[in-house]
Design a protein with these regions (language model features):
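Structural signature of Gram-negative outer-membrane beta-barrels, strongest in the C-terminal barrel
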Residues: 437-439, 449-455, 461-463, 478-480, ...
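Extracytoplasmic beta-strand/coil segments of soluble accessory domains associated
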Residues: 118-121, 126, 147-188, 204, ...
Length: 848
């Protein structure tokens, strides 16, 4: 969609504008700056006065003077006439993204440039946008993942997935993570293997985040191929003009604690500046036996070269270790053991010992060059990530470890006592299933101003994504050795390999994929006072080879290359009808390549030959209206998803009842409407509400290939009857409201309510092989969630102190976040993950 320009600097009443000598008060009504923010949920912190002509709305290319370094937008007011953020040419926004303004005679700051090249602007965007700023992120960041920070946006469903810290899942408009693009500072970071996003790789980095923008539907980026439900763009802290420092502590009533410190150097001599953040999370989780120990860091160093060129180096990462709850629960188990129940652990030698333990570290480095000329702007990026980690796993040749239970927990004593067979071999082992990847790429984008409101853009993105995974024995559980069944589990058979394995030896898995992917795009955009539009097209291609040292030996370890090409066209337009009204529409068509895991769905080197590109057709229309004290937005959308390939997870514990399968040729239609509303109720009270209603259904019957769990040999093919069934895994009806009071003396209180309904369980294709069974998946009970928080901020010279407390699920509602349908499509055979009961967070931060 091209590069959108965003700025929100501050104008002081007495400041003069470069080049004209006029004051800010004189020019603000003529060419005022614009704001970008969360159009789904706007909120402001200034006072408003009816009849005042001053408005901070309009063209985005206005000169900027003054300064604004506060985390949320707080403008200087012209005496006797408080400013307003509403009017004919813009829409008020929440979580305003403020850019430090510059002094007289200077140009925009580097932060302005970074934000401008990364985010879309709500005043001219034909997309449904939601932007959350750093202040709002800090209010919500206690012990939460990135997706959970986005709660409260219509048609967006974010949960902690299983209840383990850092394990999160995100749906937008009914589409799962593999159909949501995630970008970090404008660079796509979603995996090329499955499209999945492992949010625990980025734990702790919320404290180094400047803003997060959600773009629903087609999204603005032409360098990201996966945006069907939408895209999430994370912007980390970037250079500012003044020195700031901050430290904070968060805690929860169930034992998770986090501390962090961050420093921004401000402008240093010769154009240098630096940002740094360190954080540490540790403690117990809400779910039993789910402790966490995680660190995070971020370092950003920038250098300006004259007025037009800048270079930014960023290094970030989050080495972490956390215990997990990997097994879904039944209604009976939750009724007996409670919401925090986890059946993956027990006591071993008197200590808590969890069957599922995850650890991962993904250091990530970027080097970006930004050129901001009068007519030409260019951004070049080089990035590389080295990821490695895994978790505790298990293998069995008899009774699974989770079957040794006592009072709902794993009886490790009995399991170990029974584990040694008469010949000394092990019936069960604990292993380390490790995986990693190297992800590197180069991006170059160019934009040229043609004049008369027109711009053209072009971009290239080349990347490699090389993965590996292996499993090694970690614990024989009292036995002497393990017999690896090469003859039954490996396509190569024994092949001269020793089947007797000890601690440290590899078993079951040793493979990887090497993928290269390229994207090129062209774009055209136009902007006038009332009309703006964007049009773009992209081409992309991918090539993947797989290697496997377990199923193959000698010269056969490499597969043939699986390759393909795809394309996309997307565009949109917005018309400002006057008196605060805007209407917009956008549409997109994708011919999207299969992910590399789909090409090799068998789990061996055989290429799945009948896989073709997905076809996605997206469209939406919307209406925005703003007035002196509020606004609302109404959007309708449609997404026709054709020829989808659906795969089960290959990461499956041996006692799991899930099948290993791949479905091809699946179609779905997602329709929906979204409404958001904001109203300021006087000087100190503001209210907002939202609602979304979807109609998401599968549209055809298909077939599924069933694979052997280890060798990947196809063992069967079954018909799957799902035409007309609701799409599951996210609520199709959401309603919510917030009420916030900004009280004297620095106090603030907020109450929030959300209602989720019409959520259906996900289903296994093997439970849908009866043509007479058209019963929808189990419909999860609807539920209400009520939360509240309070904070106090005091200023002490150059220091400010904020103390807060948050109450979550105040009514103690028992609700289900995710789940899998069973054979009877009711609560008797349903299994899933329940959400947290009543809990609280608290914390404090001090800023300089």
């Amino acid at each position: 969609m091209g590069i959108a320009i965003l700025s929100a600097p501050v104008l002081r009443a007495g400041d003069s504008v470069p080049g004209g000598g006029r004051t800010a008060a004189e020019i603000v009504t003529e060419a005022p700056v614009s704001l970008v923010g969360k159009s789904d949920s706007p909120a402001f912190r200034e006072e408003r006065m009816p009849g005042c002509p001053v408005s901070l709305v309009g063209k985005s290319d206005s000169p900027a003077v003054g300064e604004n370094d506060s985390p949320a937008f707080r403008e200087e007011r012209i005496p006797g006439c408080p400013v307003s953020h509403v009017g004919e040419n813009d829409l008020p926004a929440v979580g305003e993204i403020d850019s430090p303004a510059v002094g007289e005679g200077d140009t925009l700051t580097l932060r302005d440039v970074i934000v401008s090249s990364t985010f879309s602007k709500v005043s001219r965007s034909p997309l449904r946008l939601a932007t959350i700023d750093s202040e709002t992120l800090r209010e919500r960041a206690a012990a939460r993942t990135y997706p959970e920070l986005l709660k409260g946006i219509p048609s967006l469903y974010a949960t902690s997935e299983s209840g383990s810290y850092g394990d999160a899942k995100l749906n937008i408009r009914g589409f799962g993570q593999e159909n949501i693009s995630v970008l970090l500072n404008g660079i796509p970071i979603s995996g090329l293997v499955t499209g999945s996003m492992y949010w625990n790789n980025w734990m702790g980095l919320a404290d180094a985040t400047y803003a997060v923008q959600v773009q629903k539907g087609v999204g603005a980026s032409l360098l990201s191929d996966g945006s069907v439900g939408g895209s999430v763009n994370i912007l980390t802290d970037s250079p500012s003009e003044t020195f700031t420092a901050e430290a904070g502590f968060y805690g929860s009533d169930y034992g998770t604690m986090k501390g962090y410190v961050k420093v921004a150097s401000g402008a240093l001599p010769k154009g240098w500046s630096m940002n740094m953040m360190l954080s540490h999370v540790r403690g117990s989780g809400y779910v039993d036996a789910t402790s966490v120990n995680s660190y995070a860091y971020m370092l950003s160093v920038s250098k300006r070269f004259g007025e037009e060129h800048s270079i930014i180096f960023t290094a970030l990462g989050s080495p972490e270790k956390h215990e997990q709850r990997s097994s879904r629960l039944s209604f009976a188990e939750v009724s007996e053991y409670g919401l925090s129940y986890n059946k993956n652990w027990g006591y071993r030698d008197g200590k808590v010992f969890n069957l599922s333990l995850n650890n991962y570290f993904k250091p990530y480095f970027t080097l970006q060059h930004i050129w901001s000329g009068e007519k030409v702007s260019m951004k070049n990026s080089v990035y590389v990530a080295f990821a490695s980690g895994g978790g505790r796993w298990s293998e069995t040749k008899g009774k699974p470890l989770s079957s040794y239970t006592a009072d709902g927990l794993i009886d490790w004593t009995s399991a170990i006592a029974s584990n040694r067979n008469p010949d000394g071999s092990a019936a069960n082992i604990l292993s380390q299933y490790t995986a990693g990847h190297t992800h590197a790429g180069v991006i170059s984008t160019l934009e040229y101003v043609l004049g008369r409101g027109f711009k053209v853009g072009a971009g290239l993105h080349g990347q490699i994504y090389n993965t590996w995974e292996e499993e090694t024995i970690d614990d024989l559980l009292g036995a002497d050795f393990w017999i690896e069944d090469y003859e039954g589990k490996s396509l190569a058979g024994l092949a001269g390999r020793d089947p007797v394995k000890h601690v440290g030896d590899k078993v079951r898995t040793e493979n990887g994929k090497n993928t290269s992917h390229g994207t090129a795009y062209l774009s055209l955009s136009y902007e006038s006072e009332r009309l703006s539009f964007d049009l773009g097209a992209s081409l992309f291609g991918s090539r993947t080879r797989r290697w496997d040292l377990y199923n193959y030996v000698g010269d056969d370890v490499w597969s043939d290359a699986a390759a393909g090409t795809g394309a996309s066209i997307k565009g949109g337009a917005l018309f400002k009808a006057g008196k605060g009204h805007s209407v917009y529409a956008s549409a997109g068509w994708y011919s999207r390549l299969p992910y590399s895991s789909v090409w090799f769905s068998s789990g061996n080197n055989e290429i799945t030959r009948d896989v073709t590109n997905e076809r996605n057709m997206l469209g939406e229309i919307g209406w925005r209206h703003s007035w002196a004290s509020g606004n609302f937005e109404l959007t309708g959308y449609s997404a026709y998803w054709k020829n989808k390939s659906l795969m089960s997870s290959k990461y499956k514990q041996i006692d799991s009842e899930d099948s290993r399968y791949m479905v091809t040729g699946l179609d779905a239609l997602h329709l929906g409407v979204e409404l958001s509303f904001f109203q300021r109720l006087g000087r100190w009270l503001e209210a907002e509400a939202f609602a979304s209603v979807g109609d998401w259904k599968w549209k055809n019957d298909v077939n599924a290939i069933i694979y052997d769990d280890y060798s990947g040999v196809a063992v069967g093919k079954v018909d799957v009857y799902c035409d007309g069934l609701p799409v599951g895994d996210a609520p199709q009806t959401q309603i919510g409201a917030n009420l916030k009071a900004l009280l004297p003396k620095g106090f603030a209180v907020r109450a929030s309510w959300q209602f989720n309904d019409r959520m259906y369980a996900d289903f296994d294709p093997l439970t849908r092989t009866d043509p007479e069974d058209r019963t929808p998946s189990y419909r999860l009970p609807s539920y209400h969630l009520l939360g509240a928080d309070a904070s106090w901020t005091g200023n002490f010279g150059k220091f400010s102190l904020t103390v807060f407390v948050q109450g979550n699920n105040l009514l103690g509602t028992s609700f289900i976040e995710r789940g899998k349908d069973g054979s009877s499509h009711d609560s008797d055979t349903f299994t899933g993950f329940w959400g947290f009961g009543r809990n609280a967070d608290f914390g404090a931060r001090i800023s300089f």
